[in-house]
C-alpha cells in the first residue's frame, strides 16, 4: 500500500511539471502585425517632449488602429533611454509582432507632423495619417489634451531635467495602470488613487502633469489588449529587479511599482500557503487535506521551476496560472480563509466567498485561529529564553484579549457570505492600514466571485455557528439568493426554485448555492458528487460531479 501512495504522490507532482516545454523553445509561428516604433537618436529634450505628447495622443486617438497604439506605447516607455535603438530590441523578442524602427529627426513647428530621418521607412501618406490621428482625440477628452491642465502640452521644455520630470510623471501613471490591467481592470480606481498619492508624496509624480482619468483608462485598455506591450513590460520589470542599490531613477521607480504587479492573479495560492501551511496548526493533519497538501507541494515546485517569469503569469497570459486556481484545492483553501479572516483584518476586503468554498472547513479555520492565537512556538520561545511562567503569561494575555476582543479590535463571528462593507469594521486606530489590494485579482482564472447586489447572508448565532433558519428578507434579491436549510421551520414555501449546495454526509449546512436561472427546478449537487433534489423526502442518488476552477 505504501508503494501505491508514493506512486500517487509522484503522479500528482509530475502532472504539474510534465507538460512544460524546454526553456527558450520557439513556438509555431503565426501571422504577425507590423508595428512602427519611433526612435529619436538625439537627447534633445524638446524633441523628446514633443514625442511624449505625440504618443499620448496616438494612444487616445479614437481612430487609431491597434498597431498604432502598440507602437506608441513601446515608444513612450522607451523615451527615458539614452539609446532608444538598443532599448527597443526588448520588444523584438515577442513572437506576436514585427517591429519596424522609424528614426525621427523632429516635428514641424506648431504641429505633430513627423520629420523622418532619411533611413526611416515612412511615406508621405503615413506621415499625414499620423498627424491626423494625433489631432483626432475623442470627445471624452476635455480641452483637446490628455492632461488635466490644458497648458501643460504647450509649455517649453529645453532642459533634460524638465523632460525627465515630465516623462517620469507620465510613465509612472502608465505603470500604475499596468497593476490592474489583467486582473481587476473594471474595478473602482481606489487603489490607483492611493498609489498616485504615494508617488506624489515621494516626489516621483508631479501633480501638474496628471493625465485625465479617461486618458489613463485608454492607456490601460491598450496595454490590456496588447501582448507585445506586456511582454516588453515584463522584460523591463526583470531588468528593474536585477538592479542594485545604486540604480537610476527610472528603474528604481519601475522596481517599486513592480511589487504591486508581481504574483497578481496568485493571491489565493499565496494566502493559502500563508494561513494554512505557515501557521502549522493541528487541523493540517486531517485526512481530507492529504491529497490537497500534495497538490500544494507540486504547485510550489512548479512555481520554482517556472523561474523568474513566474511572478508575471497574469501579465504574460501564461496558461500555467490556471494550475494555481483555488478550485484545485478547495478544502484547504476554505480552511486558510477561515484562519485569515481571524488573524488579518485586511482579509475582510478579499473576496473569498467562491462557489467552491466549503463552509464546514471555513468554520474549522475560524475556530482553530480563535483557539490557537495564544499558543507559543516553543522553538522561538527557546531562542528568546522565555521561562515557563513567561510563556503562560503570554498565552493568558492573548486569550484574555481574544475573549474580550480588546478596544478597537473587530469581534463577532466571521461570515464568508456577508459582503465586506457589511462586516464589522475596525476602529479608527486601524484606518491607516492599507486594504488588501488583490480583491478580485484571480476571479478570471478560478471563476470565483462574491455575492453581489448587497445580498444579506443568514444571521449568525453566538459561537460563530451559522443559523440558516428563515430570516426576514430585505429585498427581492435576497429572496432569490437564499433559502433556509430546514423548510419545516421556515416561513418560505418549500417549492421555491433554489439550489442548496449540501455537504455530503454532514448534518449542518454551511454553504448555500442558488439557481442562477431562477426559472426551473434544479437539483443541488453536493461537493462529493451527491445529488440532492428539491424534495427533501426523496432519497439522494450518487452522481459524479466536477469541481469549479
Swiss-Prot record:
One of its GO terms (biological process) is negative stranded viral RNA transcription. Changing residue 439 to A: 90% reduced phosphorylation of NP. Residues 437-447 have a biased composition (Acidic residues). Signal peptide: none annotated. This is Nucleoprotein. Belongs to the paramyxoviruses nucleocapsid family. Residues 531-549 have a biased composition (Polar residues). The modification Phosphoserine is found at residue 439. Its main location: virion. Homomultimer; forms the nucleocapsid. Binds to the viral genomic RNA. N0 interacts with the phosphoprotein (via N-terminus); this interaction allows P to chaperon N0 to avoid N polymerization before encapsidation. Interacts (via N-terminus) as N-RNA template with the phosphoprotein (via C-terminus); this interaction positions the polymerase on the template. Keywords: Capsid protein, Helical capsid protein, Host cytoplasm, Phosphoprotein, Ribonucleoprotein, RNA-binding, Viral nucleoprotein, Virion. Forms the helical nucleocapsid (NC) with 12.71 N subunits per helical turn and a rise of 5.3 Angstrom per N subunit, protecting the genome from nucleases. The encapsidated genomic RNA serves as template for transcription and replication; encapsidation by N is coupled to RNA synthesis. Forms the encapsidation complex with the phosphoprotein protein P. Before encapsidation, the newly synthesized free N protein, so-called N0, is chaperoned by P. It is found in: Virion; Host cytoplasm. Residues 437-469, 517-549 are annotated as: Disordered. GO terms for cellular component: helical viral capsid; host cell cytoplasm; ribonucleoprotein complex; viral nucleocapsid. One of its GO terms (molecular function) is structural molecule activity.
Amino acid at each position: 500500500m505504501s508503494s501505491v501512495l508514493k506512486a500517487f504522490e509522484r503522479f500528482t507532482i509530475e502532472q504539474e511539471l510534465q507538460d512544460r516545454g524546454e526553456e527558450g523553445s520557439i513556438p509555431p509561428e503565426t501571422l504577425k502585425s507590423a508595428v512602427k516604433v519611433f526612435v529619436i537618436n538625439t537627447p534633445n529634450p524638446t524633441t523628446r517632449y514633443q514625442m511624449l505628447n505625440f504618443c499620448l495622443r496616438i494612444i487616445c486617438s479614437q481612430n487609431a488602429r491597434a498597431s498604432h497604439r502598440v507602437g506608441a506605447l513601446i515608444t513612450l516607455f522607451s523615451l527615458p533611454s539614452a539609446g532608444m535603438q538598443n532599448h527597443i530590441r526588448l520588444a523584438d523578442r515577442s513572437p506576436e509582432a514585427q517591429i519596424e524602427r522609424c528614426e525621427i529627426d523632429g516635428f514641424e513647428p506648431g504641429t505633430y507632423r513627423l520629420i523622418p530621418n532619411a533611413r526611416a521607412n515612412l511615406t508621405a501618406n503615413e506621415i499625414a495619417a499620423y498627424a491626423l490621428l494625433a489631432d483626432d482625440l475623442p470627445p471624452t477628452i476635455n480641452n483637446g489634451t490628455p492632461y488635466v491642465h490644458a497648458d501643460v502640452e504647450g509649455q517649453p521644455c529645453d532642459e533634460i531635467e524638465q523632460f525627465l520630470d515630465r516623462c517620469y510623471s507620465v510613465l509612472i501613471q502608465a505603470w500604475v495602470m499596468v497593476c490592474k490591467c489583467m486582473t481587476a481592470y473594471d474595478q473602482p480606481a481606489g487603489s490607483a488613487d492611493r498609489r498616485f498619492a504615494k508617488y506624489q508624496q515621494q516626489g516621483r509624480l508631479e501633480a501638474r502633469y496628471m493625465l485625465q482619468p479617461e486618458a489613463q483608462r485608454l492607456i490601460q485598455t491598450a496595454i490590456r489588449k496588447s501582448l507585445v506591450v506586456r511582454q516588453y513590460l515584463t522584460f523591463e520589470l526583470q531588468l528593474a529587479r536585477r538592479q542594485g542599490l545604486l540604480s537610476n531613477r527610472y528603474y528604481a521607480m519601475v522596481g517599486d511599482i513592480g511589487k504591486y504587479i508581481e504574483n497578481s492573479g496568485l493571491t489565493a495560492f499565496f494566502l493559502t500557503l500563508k494561513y494554512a501551511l505557515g501557521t502549522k496548526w493541528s487541523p493540517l493533519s486531517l485526512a481530507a487535506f492529504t491529497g490537497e497538501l500534495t497538490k500544494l507541494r507540486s504547485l510550489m515546485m512548479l512555481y520554482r521551476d517556472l523561474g523568474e517569469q513566474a511572478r508575471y503569469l497574469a501579465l504574460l497570459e501564461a496558461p500555467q496560472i490556471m494550475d494555481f486556481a483555488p478550485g484545485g484545492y478547495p478544502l484547504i483553501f476554505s480552511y486558510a480563509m477561515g484562519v485569515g479572516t481571524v488573524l488579518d483584518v485586511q482579509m475582510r476586503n478579499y473576496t473569498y466567498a467562491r462557489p467552491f468554498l466549503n463552509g464546514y472547513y471555513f468554520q474549522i479555520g475560524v475556530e482553530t485561529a480563535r483557539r490557537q492565537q495564544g499558543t507559543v512556538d516553543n522553538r522561538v520561545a527557546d531562542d528568546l529564553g522565555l521561562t515557563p511562567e513567561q510563556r503562560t503569561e503570554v498565552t493568558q494575555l492573548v486569550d484574555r484579549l481574544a475573549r474580550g476582543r480588546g478596544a478597537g479590535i473587530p469581534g463577532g463571528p466571521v461570515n464568508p457570505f456577508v459582503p465586506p462593507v457589511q462586516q464589522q469594521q475596525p476602529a479608527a486606530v486601524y484606518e491607516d492600514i492599507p486594504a488588501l489590494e488583490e480583491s478580485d485579482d484571480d476571479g478570471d482564472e478560478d471563476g470565483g466571485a462574491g455575492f453581489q447586489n448587497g445580498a444579506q447572508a443568514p444571521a449568525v448565532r453566538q459561537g460563530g455557528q451559522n443559523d440558516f433558519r428563515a430570516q426576514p428578507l430585505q429585498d427581492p434579491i435576497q429572496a432569490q439568493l437564499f433559502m433556509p436549510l430546514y423548510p419545516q421551520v421556515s416561513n418560505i414555501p418549500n417549492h421555491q426554485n433554489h439550489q442548496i449546495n449540501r455537504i455530503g454526509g454532514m448534518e449542518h449546512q454551511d454553504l448555500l448555492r442558488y439557481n442562477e436561472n431562477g426559472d426551473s427546478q434544479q437539483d443541488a449537487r453536493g461537493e462529493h458528487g451527491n445529488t440532492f433534489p428539491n424534495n427533501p423526502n426523496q432519497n439522494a442518488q450518487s452522481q459524479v460531479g466536477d469541481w469549479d476552477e
